[in-house]
């Protein structure tokens, strides 16, 4: 362990402030009363955070590089810092081990931290504090618009939790896109205006994404990740994510200027080989706390007020951050640790090997997975309605899907990833988070993309050699779970369509689905390990 500032530790250390890899915010609640004459900051790079799940090279690189840049900024301030580097010979490999060492060496009177984003990490650090009989002061994460307590108040007495009601309450609380107590434009939700595809002509000339060339710190991290986690999926070669606050602010400005105006209309659209489209690519910077959501939404709202971006685009973007982001955090912290065990549909199939390689004949999955491995990124429809949908229809064990999502994406922190995966994508919580399972046949993907045009499978066919696995599995899913789905009014239309199929057609679909599942089960192995 070493002090990267080169400053002497305060002789009687009042507070050791713990800063985690997703808490890179100089205005964090844990630092509000920081006194460099009495306090010190603790940060630690450990193998545990890249190996408790198989973290992709892009994900490990973004966390480690952002942490080292944050540490360098603390050094400029002259703040005492204990920083454990991953490659240090005495690194224990775990957060608990590194914190135990720091406490034993420097004997702080108290530990302080902002509430973490991972239940496992919270329990680990609490156990260390308890072992040393130290007070651990866990402060509300003021990065967010709402507290967990406020979410609990909202949830109390409700039989079902739904995003829309919580989102409206936060709009009223914050005044974002509000006018005279009413939503700007006279309605809360412009989803119906935000579902366009690119059509046969495609997206045309797209604005380039923000790219940040690796500096010396990032290059050092890239080499370390490549050497230490060579067997992990993905590549460090295309790394260009923002890893400092300055870069994150630049990425925000670029999104507002170049992509926000078209974001809403095309937020659900996909196109072969086009990774970035009109999306913000800001979720990683937000989840590392390099950006504050207030400044992000203020910039978006200003773009609407100045006539730069239409209301449906801005409202759709606001809902992702003020709505979904806050909502899933509330779900996570009010239902952990048991939430992680949910498997309402008793799905047990293994995750297919091609999720770690992209080697599949299904064009939509191949494109989404290969770009995920190359960049640590896919937009929300690719995650929900391609990789997530296939896993749901196939019947993959939701915990395996969760570990894949948590490991491969640069923006993945458990508080946001787990509810999105188990609740929204896999319906493993039985409807706690979402009002229905998000299922569709291959025709949805055909409507929203050009993937099917170059695919050997036909989205209109459920049986036969050219049958699209999405379509086959969609109908089979409806048959397998018909009794459960019949209790949900939002699924009745899909079940009526199922009931129109002749018995012999349903039998043929069930047989083909069984054959496909067996083939995927036999092909599943341990590619990532």
Where are these regions (language model features)?
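Hydrophobic/aromatic-rich, well-ordered segments within soluble, folded domains that form packed cores
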Residues: 62-82, 112-113, 375-399
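Beta-rich, aromatic/charged-enriched effector core domains that present basic-aromatic interfaces
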Residues: 94-241
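Glycine-rich phosphate-binding "P-loop"
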Residues: 78-93, 354-357
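A generic structural motif
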Residues: 44-45, 135-147, 415-423
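A eukaryotic "domain-start" boundary segment
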Residues: 49, 172-285, 463-471, 482-529
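C-terminal catalytic domain of photolyase/cryptochrome flavoproteins
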Residues: 7-8, 20, 27, 250, ...
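N-terminal beta-strand-loop-alpha-helix module at the start
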Residues: 2-86
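A short acidic (Asp/Glu
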Residues: 27-31, 53-55, 93-96, 121-126, ...
